[in-house]
Amino acid sequence: MVSTATKIATFAFDNCLMNAAGVYCMTKEELLAIEASEAGSFVTKTGTLAPRQGNPEPRYADTALGSINSMGLPNHGYQYYLDIVTEMQKDQASKHHFLSVVGMSAEETETILKAIQASDYQGLVELNLSCPNVPGKPQLAYDFEATDQLLKKIFSYYTKPLGIKLPPYFDIVHFDQAAAIFNQYPLAFVNCVNSIGNGLVIDDEQVVIKPKSGFGGIGGDYIKPTALANVHAFYQRLNPSIQIIGTGGVKTGRDAFEHILCGAAMVQIGTALHQEGPAIFKRITKELQDIMAEKGYQTLDDFRGQLQYKP
């Protein structure tokens, strides 16, 4: 029987597919819909110290090749999501989950993580270092010195499993520099990638979203080559103990297969989930299993990271 089961840190998952933070995860009802689907897990909306309304609407638009958004981190506050995942972990039948968080400053991020450290939650945390859509707030993971300083502080007190969501990098030297920093810390995973920041989509003569004069994060088909490159570059450079979650441009089993071939242990779905709903996990899982069966692969480990190069 072909299996799409996988593992991140000490946590086992029946399926390698899940949602991406920001999609189908704002409310408890949405999270329960992902929980009830074929997805192996869910990640919550990125929770901030206080609830946020986010940017003015319209702030999301589908396009022929994906999507553009400038949501601005709307969420119910980290405590809302922490309560949900803490309650769900009491159920033996529950899946393991990811709690996504970030502060609007380094100090706020530490406040949140210290609260999680002191809580009963034992699951995975995804620290979002890469939101491109908050006006006046840069993507922290592009500042290597600041990222290093923040991780150094965090791991001086935080002992639970923690990973980071990264923006896309485009320069080989940046992969080298980032990996050198990440390898210094006991990260459970890195997630490659968040949307490509500050794209522009135009309808006739006008931008399609309102915030930031129409500038927003690009997702979907547009970003798959960039996402695959980031997954594989970090797979080549990171300590084996740091797993990789692949995110970007996944709407078929073939897309998921390519992420895993590049080194991903799990695969998140964003734009396509927004367009198709939680039933997408059943479809993509079957498509992935069919590809694996056709190639004679029984488990993800049979081909994960085995990308072939031209001789």
Curated annotation (Swiss-Prot):
GO cellular component: cytoplasm
Protein name: Putative dihydroorotate dehydrogenase A (fumarate)
Function per UniProt: Catalyzes the conversion of dihydroorotate to orotate with fumarate as the electron acceptor.
Major location (coarse): cytoplasm
Quaternary structure (record): Homodimer.
Localization in the cell: Cytoplasm
Catalytic residue positions: C131
CDD domains on file: DHOD_1A_like (cd04741)
The species this protein was found in: Streptococcus equi subsp. zooepidemicus (strain H70)
GO molecular function: dihydroorotate dehydrogenase (fumarate) activity
Assigned EC number: 1.3.98.1
Broad enzyme group: oxidoreductase
Classification via PROSITE patterns: DHODEHASE_2
The record's free-text note on cofactor binding: Binds 1 FMN per subunit.
Annotated binding of substrate, by residue: K45, N69, S70, M71, G72, L73, N128, N194, S195
Catalytic reaction list: (S)-dihydroorotate + fumarate = orotate + succinate
Gene Ontology BP annotations: 'de novo' pyrimidine nucleobase biosynthetic process; 'de novo' UMP biosynthetic process
UniProt xrefs under Pfam families: DHO_dh
The entry's keywords: Cytoplasm, Flavoprotein, FMN, Oxidoreductase, Pyrimidine biosynthesis
InterPro entries cross-referenced by the UniProt entry: Aldolase_TIM (IPR013785), DHO_dehydrogenase (IPR050074), DHOD_1A (IPR033886), Dihydroorotate_DH_1 (IPR024920), Dihydroorotate_DH_1_2 (IPR012135), Dihydroorotate_DH_cat (IPR005720), Dihydroorotate_DH_CS (IPR001295)
Binding positions for FMN per the UniProt entry: K45, T46, N128, K165, V193, G220, G248, G249, G270, T271
